[in-house]
Amino acid sequence: MTVALAATALVSAQAQSEFKPLAGSVTTDFSLFANGIFNQTESPVALGSHAGINAGLIKGRYFLQDNIALRLSLGLNNSSSTQKTTDPVTEATTKSNVFTFGLGLEHHFGGTDRLSPYIGAELFLGSATGSMKSVNSAATTISKNAPRFVFGGDLLLGADYYVAPHVYLGVEAGLELLHASTGKTSSTTTPAGGTATTNESKSTASAGGFATDVKAGFKVGFVF
């Protein structure tokens, strides 16, 4: 009987180690839906055109123990678009840049041989900038949006399911507490053959609040 129990425990441990990461393992995963797919409550603090910190999320984890992982999150979203008209002749170029960074810890529970549920906490910060350049026969105007900065923390709940050794699919939800501040806007107009004139706003703003959000929708990841 004792031998049978020991054999069962050994097989179970081998099955878990075949799929799940152990102490010293490194994982990385990528968001399949960067802005979430189940959002019912959007963050009251937007970062650029994105709510919360969901811009192009990539996450890495280092397992300090079999069930404790240090996590690092990085979000990037850069875009540029140009519109042209012929009557009158104008060209408008819009650019935006969003960057986010997070650092936290996860505690993983036993689950099953393939399923790894976890809870965690994370601190994050981010920034967003944007501008528009408009060119016509009369003048060139460059307008810079007010830069936005956000910082805060998350309480996290998620699960990873290992579809094959060292390959997993997962989902993660989070309760966010965040604060954002907004800088000044500016606009520079240069008439054709003239001198540039710059106007800058004098005011700044800030906001904060709670939001519930499936931060990264589904994700796919790998264990190294």
Q: Where do the PLM segments sit?
A:
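Outer-membrane beta-barrel channels and translocator barrels
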Residues: Q65-N67, G110-R114, Y162-A164
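Outer-membrane beta-barrel translocator domains and adjoining extracellular loop/strand segments
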Residues: F38-L47, A51, S81-T94, A128-T141, ...
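Outer-membrane beta-barrel architecture
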Residues: K59, G104-E106, D154-G158, K219
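Residue-level signature of outer-membrane beta-barrel architecture
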Residues: Y62, H107-F109, A159-Y161, L177, ...
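Short glycine/proline- and aromatic-enriched beta-strand/turn motifs that initiate or cap beta-hairpins
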Residues: Q14-S79, Q83-K84, G130, G208-F224
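Short sequence motifs at beta-strands and strand-loop junctions characteristic
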Residues: S49-I53, T93-T100, G111, N145-G152, ...
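Transmembrane beta-strands of outer-membrane beta-barrel proteins
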Residues: G24-F30, L70-L72, F99-F101, P117-L123, ...
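Predominantly the C-terminal beta-signal and adjacent terminal strand-loop region
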Residues: V163-F224
